[in-house]
């Protein structure tokens, strides 16, 4: 698939010295600036060694992030008012209140267990090394990873949004978490069995995707061409699997608000800062552990000094280490979800009771102020 490297269109994501020597020499002759990139990458030509690639990515994604941040501020502007949350009044909260919340708020305790294990194993699932091994070694076609990401992203988001809108509204957030969790477990088992019985073992001819790019309309017509059966089934399985399991990871943020309301119901104290800080800390901690978990898995199959890359030949050890990180470890996280949700007290009915009680407390506070 074409990649721009120092203003030259390189016909493949990575050109290797062994297989593409003449092609590399021709490109260097056209643009001598490529010579330094070839030297740094050991005779190969890869977009990863091109500073211009990362400059472009920084500007593009930084700009998009800024636009979306402004959109979020505009959307929340009118609702970001104390009368819509907590008790509608300012309260003094001390260290003793935080300690009591952590010690006795069963809802936040269980949600932290659920969210941390979910985050850890979702991070191993999407780790860069795991994707390199899955697409570059097992499928033998790392260039297909870009098409895979763009083809699956929108359907996964749509499925997640539709399910969340339907299930969370009718059954409550705890039920949504469990639906996403069991969907993730079932999907993981299905993908494991599929890859076990239809393992390409590095044969790129068995795994091919269209050269589709969301930002390039000229490629949209290729979406329905260039598929192999293995690739098509895998992509459909991943879309269904990821769309359903996204419920469990996406619903966590709104469940923290329920935990804050539960604390108001339990003690009369509103401590949203504690909830946000706790989740931010857990998120950063477990995200940093994901790379260590992945490294441990691959070290068990012989990669103690360096992790596999796209030039590493296929082996059964790599297959099982990748399957472990991609689908089996997430099952462990989802089983932790099931256990945590068993002890999570905030059902849909309980939240209705809590909201009624908070409404009563607010009314009493307003009457006193009047």
Named regions from a protein language model:
Residues 1-21, 48-50, 60-64, 122, ...:
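Substrate-agnostic recognition of the 12-TM MFS/MFS-like secondary transporter fold
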Residues 1-147, 168-170, 322-370:
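Intracellular loop-helix junctions on the cytosolic face of multi-pass helical membrane proteins
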Residues 12-47, 199-226, 304-316:
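Membrane-interfacial helical/loop segments at transmembrane boundaries in membrane proteins
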Residues 167-170, 201, 207-209, 277-308, ...:
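Intrinsically disordered cytosolic tails
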Residues 52, 170-175, 270, 301:
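Membrane-helix interface residues
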Residues 55-67, 148-156, 221-245, 282-286, ...:
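Hydrophobic alpha-helical transmembrane segments
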Residues 76-245:
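Membrane-embedded translocation segments of transport machinery
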Residues 132-137, 170, 255-266, 300:
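Helix-to-coil boundary motifs at intracellular loop junctions of multi-pass secondary transporters
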């Amino acid at each position: 698939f074409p990649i721009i490297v120092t203003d030259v269109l390189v016909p493949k994501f990575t050109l290797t010295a062994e297989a593409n020597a003449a092609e590399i020499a021709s490109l260097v002759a056209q643009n001598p600036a490529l010579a330094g990139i070839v030297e740094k990458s050991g005779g190969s030509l890869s977009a990863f060694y091109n500073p211009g690639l990362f400059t472009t990515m920084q500007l593009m994604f930084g700009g998009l992030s800024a636009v979306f941040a402004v959109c979020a501020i505009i959307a929340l502007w009118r609702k970001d008012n104390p009368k819509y949350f907590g008790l509608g009044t300012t309260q003094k909260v001390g260290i003793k209140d935080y300690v009591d919340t952590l010690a006795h708020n069963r809802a936040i305790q269980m949600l932290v267990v659920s969210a941390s294990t979910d985050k850890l194993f979702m991070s191993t699932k999407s780790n860069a090394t795991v994707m390199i091994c899955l697409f570059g070694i097992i499928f033998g076609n790392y260039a297909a990873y870009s098409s895979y990401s763009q083809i699956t992203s929108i359907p996964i988001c749509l499925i997640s949004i539709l399910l969340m809108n339907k299930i969370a509204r009718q059954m409550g957030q705890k039920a949504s978490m469990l639906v996403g969790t069991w969907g993730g477990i079932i999907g993981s088992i299905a993908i494991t069995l599929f890859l076990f019985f239809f393992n390409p073992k590095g044969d790129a001819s068995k795994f091919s995707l269209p050269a589709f790019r969301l930002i390039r309309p000229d490629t949209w017509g290729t979406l329905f061409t260039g598929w192999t059966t293995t690739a098509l089934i895998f992509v459909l399985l991943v879309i269904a699997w990821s769309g359903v399991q996204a419920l469990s990871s996406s619903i966590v943020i709104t469940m923290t608000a329920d935990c804050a309301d539960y604390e108001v119901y339990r003690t009369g104290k509103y401590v949203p800062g504690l909830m946000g800080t706790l989740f931010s800390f857990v998120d950063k901690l477990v995200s940093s552990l994901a790379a260590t978990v992945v490294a441990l898995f691959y070290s068990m199959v012989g990669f103690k000094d360096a992790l596999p890359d796209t030039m590493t030949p296929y082996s059964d050890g790599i297959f099982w280490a990748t399957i472990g990180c991609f689908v089996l470890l997430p099952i462990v996280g989802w089983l932790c979800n099931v256990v945590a949700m068993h002890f999570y007290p905030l059902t849909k009915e309980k939240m209705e009771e809590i909201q009624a009680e908070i409404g009563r407390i607010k009314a009493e506070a307003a009457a006193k102020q009047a």
